[in-house]
Amino acid sequence: MIVALIEKVYSFLWGDLIHIPLPGGGSVGISLLIILLIPTGIYFTVRTRLLPIRMFPDMIKALTGKKENKDSLSTFQTLIVSTATRVGMGNLVGVVAAISVGGAGAVFWMWITAIIGSSTAFVEATLAQLHKEPDPLYSGYRGGPAYYIHHYFEDKSGKKKKHVIIAVLFAISGLICWCGISQVISNSVTSSFENAFGVPTIYTTIILVAVAAVIVLRKNATVKVLDIVVPIMAVCYFVITIFIIIKNIGMMPSVFSRIFEEAFGIRQVAAGGFGAVLMNGVKRGLFSNEAGSGSAPCAAAAAECDTPVKAGLTQALGVFIDTIVICSCTAMIMLTAPENIVAGKEGMDLLQSAMRYHLGDFGVIFIAVTLFLFSFSTFLGILFYARSNVAYLFGDNWISQTMYKVLALVMLFVGGIAAYTFVWDLGDVGIGLMTIFNTGILYLMGGQAIKELRVFEESNKAQSNSQCSQQGDNVTQ
């Protein structure tokens, strides 16, 4: 009964809700989440006046802010946490799947969704900063969609409330989602290590859970570990990709030509394949960078910064790093490998075959280790997100915090030794419901973030004019 219900909800959220016919007899199937996320991204890209493009330098500057409270997080540290959860298995296997089904053109649409997704990420992160509150358990600050949803309905009613039903549903959806993801993470890691090194899954699982337990059961060890692991894993993957690109530099014109030709190609439209190109790129871009799902705001709220806009700009940059940089790295690895090398393969096997072609056996080992680091950091990141949602539901007590961590560790163990698709579907349902609750409230509250952006821009303009005036006075003297 419950399994059947979950399957129906999963199909409603992730299945093709509508079909748009295309020339050549094909059609584009669009899911409910795509219907929600794409218009939301476009809407806020217009409202912010192309923020991801015109304010990219400000995104970089936002990382340099210093914190006064040693227990709080800097904007850079919150970027590390959100990048840890964004950059995961989807950046490897997900991109491979998108290209396998949608072709090289899917990469272009992945880039487009990153641009509009950055605008959504800015708005939700700025709102999280505006509605954050002190964290008496971990010190610093906490917040996220559950908190700004709560404040919205509390302000509307004019009465103090302990809980708001929509905020409660969001928090529960998040906790369900992150437990499901824990299973996917461990299953991917153990399978990868078994294929690459022949290590039995039970051994990898025990080590994975033991290391995770040592970190997550300590009060503030998660961020300290991520501060080290995330930059190393991202830089190593980027450097290896640059090496592969340089090694195959002669192929780059044809690779980019394929990306753009297949993104708009008449041949794809005529063959009815344009829908696959478009939707696979869009899906991979949206669900890799998490913009709109409400996950990253849980990290953004923890930042200590002099204006909420800086937290928003930081998370917009996170979308760029995830999709434009890391996902593109995987795409370049795939598109520079000969078709006969990867033919007939899928998923992780396909990516490992491409890496074996480029770097020999080292490539296979490197991908296995990279998947471990990407996935492990994702697990640590989602438990950081869970803190604020557990606190919203159960109050400020260590019992509930510890119980959820133990539950996540159990799911990590179970996922390492067996694959339960029901639990995976439950996790996907969780993130789908999170997205529905979050995008709905963004339309109602997004004006607050836009107002903060206008104030920020006016302040920067006034500061710039003041500096120019001072320089003019100095020249006159």
Sequence positions of predicted segments:
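Membrane-interface loop-to-helix entry segments
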Residues: 36, 44-60, 166, 187-193, ...
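Transmembrane helix-loop junctions in multi-pass membrane proteins
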Residues: 47-52, 91-95, 177-190, 213-225, ...
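N-terminal alpha-helical transmembrane segments of multi-pass membrane transport
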Residues: 1-89, 99-106, 117, 443-477
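Extracellular/periplasmic helix-exit of transmembrane alpha-helices
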Residues: 124-136, 242-258, 272, 302-305, ...
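Helix-loop-helix module between adjacent transmembrane segments
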Residues: 40-45, 116-141, 150-215, 369-380, ...
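Flexible loop linkers connecting adjacent transmembrane helices
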Residues: 50-75, 97, 103-106, 119-161, ...
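Selective recognition of specific alpha-helical transmembrane segments in multi-pass small-molecule
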Residues: 116-124, 204-219, 230-250, 283-286, ...
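Alpha-helical membrane segments and immediately flanking helix-loop junctions
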Residues: 69-101, 127-130, 137-153, 169-172, ...
